[in-house]
């Protein structure tokens, strides 16, 4: 700090700083310690110098003794210089302490400054008609003197302490004591790795035992009086937490380390060390558990029919379509009857038909190699109708409906063959039909319903939809779709007057006319 800064502050500030400080005691103690260190360095240097002077007269002689003396001479010189530096540091500490003592003695005291303020207050209060003008002026001049004196004292103290700090010597690091020929000799012999490893393990073991010995000593001291020590720790943390943490931090660390390691460390290391023995047991248990797991097989996927039934493309004038239907359980078979019709021109060939699937479970479509195709017919109820498979538009529509229905059901299509046939209840043991018993309505359902509060009329009506077969051993158990009433029992049936015969149906269940 410069002189104008010291001058800017009142003398009370400087006097309070010097009076309330730690005093010169710490500087004097530091000077004493440096003096003792200087004496120790000097004693060590003198002892080592005497030892080096006696080396040539001992058992060592020749170059080895000379190398030994030459290796220690720099260290002896450093000890001598360190002793001088320590003595200089002690002298500078003493100079700083003397400067502080001088500044404190020359600084106006707080009592003098307080007395000056009290006298000034009294003189101003009793200054009637200016009778205290001269005493007030003298008092203010005395205060100005103390102001200037305090600033000057602080300036001198700053200069003296700064000079002592700047002139204090700096001790350099000690030189390494090494034999000049030792480096070459060390390269001759090879280093034994086992000795180096043993030395490293010994150092690690010493560090480990020292660390545990230190912790156990702290814990043992705490266990001598656990209640009293706990109370002391709590009081220390409540009064001064920082100092308590510095004082009792090592003890708390030792306790926490032991608690954590005993609860977590030992089980963890036990599992790690025993893992090679537990691995085969765990592997065996895992394989045994796998043996009891259920095996889920993937469902078999039935490939869809790659080649659907194709309708035969023939000329309409050369081949006449016919319908053949076999009704199982009734013992009748339908025969195809040709019918006259207008033939289209022979020059035009029909377009190829799209793939189509069978429309009924009891009717199997056939290819063109087996003659007229089987399946539902297209047209009205009367006359000879062409099968749907022989008409391109109808075949395409039937194929589209079949594909849509297959996609909705999400089922795999099954391959059908033209030479296969299906018998329904072929082993039921039905005898020859004795007569037309008629069809009666099924007893399932709510029956015929009318208006509320009215009774139904009992009259015979022809059943439509699902019916039950009469006169068999199953009663109304098995069901089958209705077929046209024109399909009578027996193999021979006269042709209808209009020439329609038995082939005039469209293949769909409906009532007979």
Swiss-Prot record:
Pfam families: PPE, PPE-PPW. It is a multi-pass membrane protein. Disruption phenotype: PE5-PPE4 double mutant exhibits a severe iron phenotype but secretes EsxG and EsxH normally. Mildly attenuated in vivo. It comes from the Bacteria. Keywords: Cell membrane, Membrane, Transmembrane, Transmembrane helix. The chain crosses the membrane at residues 233-253, 277-297, 309-329. InterPro entries: PPE-PPW_C (IPR043641), PPE_dom (IPR000030), PPE_sf (IPR038332). GO terms for biological process: response to host immune response. The keyword RNA-binding does not apply. One of its GO terms (cellular component) is plasma membrane. It is found in: Cell membrane. Its main location: membrane. Residues 395-446, 469-513 are annotated as: Disordered. Belongs to the mycobacterial PPE family. PANTHER family: GLUTAMINE-RICH PROTEIN 2 (PTHR46766:SF1). Important for the siderophore-mediated iron-acquisition function of ESX-3. Was identified as a high-confidence drug target. This is PPE family protein PPE4. The lineage of its organism: Bacteria, Bacillati, Actinomycetota, Actinomycetes, Mycobacteriales. The gene is PPE4.
